[in-house]
């Protein structure tokens, strides 16, 4: 049998990787429903998973706990499988405010959102890959458990064109309009088509760089070509057939829309009667007005704002049935891999109840019909029923994963680089600040970095101020810092712009920082979720990528959580040391290009686009920019122009450039105030 996956890597599996790959692959072949990969920080878990997928020869969904880790995972998988369909499926909202009603203040908040067009294209590309190819790897966030269009309706709506078919040009254009493509003969963009004589050009919604040209000879399809929409260069000519996918996952055949409208009218009548009987006349008037407007829009245009609230009728599902999700697109032999499962699994369980609470208020006060409650994420038990064979991946698996795996745990403790887990020390709380200061000075001389984790925001602020007064280059990472700036701060730490990063819940799961040689955990003996066994192991793991990694736990007594975390770290060190001695391995420092890590998740950039080496890395604090003295009118114009550029960069996920523009705008605003 020919291999589906082409795994490209300069390295062969080493350390614990071969054993883990063999165990997981054999488990899949034996039909095990759940397995766990217990992989420590820096042990090459992603490479192990890539090998498992390649050997299993099956499509897979990889779930990550957030967009940052999903982007990192996507970048790594893309590098391992350049010739396969590695796709990215996360929420396409740059900004999302769901509709909500606050009864206490009688405030209705309209739904407001900003959709990232590029991520929308990648989502469509992901479902297309699952429908068309066996070698699909989809890296997704928890967005995968939210309602998506019904796969049956989606497949039914696809437009198949074949060379030699007899089709009236108007029929093709009508079908494209049904797929929600719009005609634009001037600006040709994704999700649009244009007509020039007997030639129809279509820019498929799921494509980022290819468009299709349909050439007609009277009513016959004479030629089908694929071309570059920017240059017009034909890439493939005389294709025998081509399939055009709908512009959105929420398309529905006309007959089903008409049937859905009848069902909505019936439910509206029942709801009106109920509200009148309970003397809720304002709510009855609200629901009538809103629903009738939606019905009119669906009749005329085939869709309406908030059409997902009628998904029960549009998908033909019964009340209470689970909504269609990404898992409905996954073939029956697919795999599910849950990364950082100790975080991701609880996330999946939490989504349903939060969504339900908000919608029940909307239904009660007449803003939505009760059927809107079926537009929801999956319940946890529904997710369990839908999930195919699953591999949980974590350095600290939760009780749920361990229970489900029933002893089927692949231990990946030995790192290919030979690096050991950090050396642990427990020191008294009384002198923790002064002791920490002396440790920081030792690291600063060696050009190494330090992470310090505290229990409270106040303590983190006071400690940062104290260290700053003692001439330590320190920054404080807190909850008010947005994702963009957080990434910049991490990069600046790695570049040596400062030596110490203080925080509360410091990146227990996240990006690699090989420069960090010391992790200091203050008040480690205060039991709680920030000092639980798993939290401590994850925090200690931040120093595991450094040759001289060390973790200091400041405590007056050793708690159960500390004891378990210390025992587990010691177990790992002993196993790693024994392997190194047996194989004659000398631990090697991990060198990872800083720019590579920061660009790993920049998925919106063209694969061909290269970043110039002369472009300086932007920093959290740029040197002061000089501006000529401008009039208030000129300043206003300049601010408007920069804001447009900032939003464009943010839409394209070019967060560093967006932050740069934001800082420029702030300086101009201050200048504007001073001049006014």
Curated annotation (Swiss-Prot):
Functionally, this protein is described as follows: The UvrABC repair system catalyzes the recognition and processing of DNA lesions. A damage recognition complex composed of 2 UvrA and 2 UvrB subunits scans DNA for abnormalities. Upon binding of the UvrA(2)B(2) complex to a putative damaged site, the DNA wraps around one UvrB monomer. DNA wrap is dependent on ATP binding by UvrB and probably causes local melting of the DNA helix, facilitating insertion of UvrB beta-hairpin between the DNA strands. Then UvrB probes one DNA strand for the presence of a lesion.
Intracellular or extracellular location(s): Cytoplasm
Q: Could you list this entry's UniProt keywords, alphabetically sorted.
A: ATP-binding, Cytoplasm, DNA damage, DNA excision, DNA repair, Excision nuclease, Nucleotide-binding, SOS response
Query: Ranges for the Helicase ATP-binding domain?
Result: 26-414
Q: What's the family?
A: Belongs to the UvrB family.
Record-annotated UVR domain positions = 636-671
What is this protein's name? UvrABC system protein B
Species source reads: Vibrio vulnificus (strain YJ016)
According to the UniProt entry, the note on domains is: The beta-hairpin motif is involved in DNA binding.
Kindly give the SUPFAM superfamilies that the UniProt entry links to this protein: C-terminal UvrC-binding domain of UvrB, P-loop containing nucleoside triphosphate hydrolases
Q: How does it assemble?
A: Forms a heterotetramer with UvrA during the search for lesions. Interacts with UvrC in an incision complex.
List each copy of the Helicase C-terminal domain by range. 432-598
Where does this chain mainly localize?
cytoplasm
**What HAMAP family does UniProt report for this protein, alphabetically?**
UvrB (MF_00204)
Molecular function per GO: ATP binding; ATP hydrolysis activity; DNA binding; excinuclease ABC activity
List the GO biological process terms.
nucleotide-excision repair; SOS response
Q: NCBIfam families, from UniProt?
A: PRK05298.1 (NF003673), uvrb (TIGR00631)
- Binding annotation for ATP: 39-46
Beta-hairpin (motif): residue ranges: 92-115
Quote a single Gene Ontology cellular component term: cytoplasm
């Amino acid at each position: 049998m020919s291999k589906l996956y082409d795994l490209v890597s300069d390295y062969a599996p080493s350390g614990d990787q071969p054993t883990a790959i063999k165990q997981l692959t054999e488990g899949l072949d034996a039909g095990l429903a759940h397995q766990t990969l217990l992989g420590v920080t820096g042990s090459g878990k992603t490479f192990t998973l890539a090998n498992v997928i390649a050997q299993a020869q099956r499509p897979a969904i990889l779930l990550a706990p957030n967009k940052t880790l999903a982007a990192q995972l996507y970048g790594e998988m893309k590098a391992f499988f350049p010739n396969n369909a590695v796709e990215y499926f996360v929420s396409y909202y740059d900004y999302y405010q769901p509709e909500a009603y606050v009864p206490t203040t009688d405030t209705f908040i309209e739904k407001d959102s900003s959709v990232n067009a590029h991520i929308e294209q990648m989502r469509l590309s992901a479902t297309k890959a699952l429908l068309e190819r066996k070698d699909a790897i989809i890296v997704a966030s928890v967005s995968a458990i939210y309602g998506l269009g019904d796969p049956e309706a989606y497949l039914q709506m696809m437009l198949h064109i074949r060379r030699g078919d007899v089709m009236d040009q108007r029929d093709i254009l009508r079908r494209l309009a049904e797929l929600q493509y719009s005609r634009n003969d001037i600006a040709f963009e994704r999700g649009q088509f244009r007509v020039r004589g007997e030639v129809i050009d279509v820019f498929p919604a799921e494509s980022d760089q290819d468009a299709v040209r349909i050439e007609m000879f009277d009513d016959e399809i004479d030629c089908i070509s694929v071309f570059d929409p920017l240059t017009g260069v034909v890439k493939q000519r005389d294709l025998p057939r081509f399939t055009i996918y709908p512009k959105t996952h929420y398309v529905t055949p006309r007959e089903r829309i008409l049937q859905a409208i009848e069902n909505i009218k019936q439910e509206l009548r029942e709801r009106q009667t109920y509200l009148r009987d309970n003397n809720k006349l304002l709510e009855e008037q609200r629901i009538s007005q809103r629903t009738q407007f939606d019905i009119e829009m669906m009749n005329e245009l085939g869709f309406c704002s908030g059409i997902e609230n009628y998904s029960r009728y549009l998908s033909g599902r019964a009340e209470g049935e689970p909504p269609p999700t990404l898992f409905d697109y996954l073939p029956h032999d697919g795999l599910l891999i849950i990364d950082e499962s100790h975080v991701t699994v609880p996330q999946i369980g939490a989504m349903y109840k939060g969504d339900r609470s908000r919608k029940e208020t909307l239904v009660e006060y007449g803003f939505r019909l009760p059927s809107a409650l079926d537009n929801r994420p999956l319940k946890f038990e529904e997710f369990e029923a839908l999930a195919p064979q699953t591999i949980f991946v974590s350095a600290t698996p939760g009780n749920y994963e361990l229970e489900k795996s029933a002893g089927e745990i692949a231990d990946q403790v030995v790192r290919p680089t030979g690096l050991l887990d950090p050396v642990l020390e427990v020191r008294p709380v009384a002198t923790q600040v002064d002791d920490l200061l002396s440790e920081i000075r030792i690291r600063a001389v060696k050009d190494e970095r330090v992470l310090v984790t505290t229990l409270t925001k106040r303590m983190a602020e006071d400690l940062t101020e104290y260290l700053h007064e003692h001439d330590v280059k320190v920054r404080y990472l807190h909850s008010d810092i947005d994702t963009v700036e957080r990434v910049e701060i991490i990069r600046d730490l790695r570049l040596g712009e400062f030596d110490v990063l203080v925080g509360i819940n410091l990146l227990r799961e996240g990006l690699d920082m090989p420069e960090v040689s010391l992790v200091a955990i203050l008040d480690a003996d205060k039991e709680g979720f920030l000092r639980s066994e798993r939290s401590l192991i994850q925090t200690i793991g931040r120093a595991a990528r450094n040759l001289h990694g060390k973790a200091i736990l400041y405590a007056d007594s050793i708690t159960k959580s500390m004891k378990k975390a210390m025992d587990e770290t010691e177990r790992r060190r002993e196993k790693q040391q024994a392997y190194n001695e047996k194989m004659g391995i000398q631990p090697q420092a991990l060198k990872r290009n800083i720019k590579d890590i920061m660009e790993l998740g920049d998925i919106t950039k063209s694969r061909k686009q290269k970043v110039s080496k002369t472009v300086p890395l932007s920093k959290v604090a740029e040197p002061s920019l000089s501006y000529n003295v401008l009039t208030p009118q000129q300043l206003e114009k300049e601010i408007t122009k920069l804001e447009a550029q900032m939003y464009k960069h943010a839409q394209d996920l070019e967060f560093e450039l967006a932050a740069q523009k934001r800082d420029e705008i702030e300086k101009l605003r201050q200048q504007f105030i001073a001049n006014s």
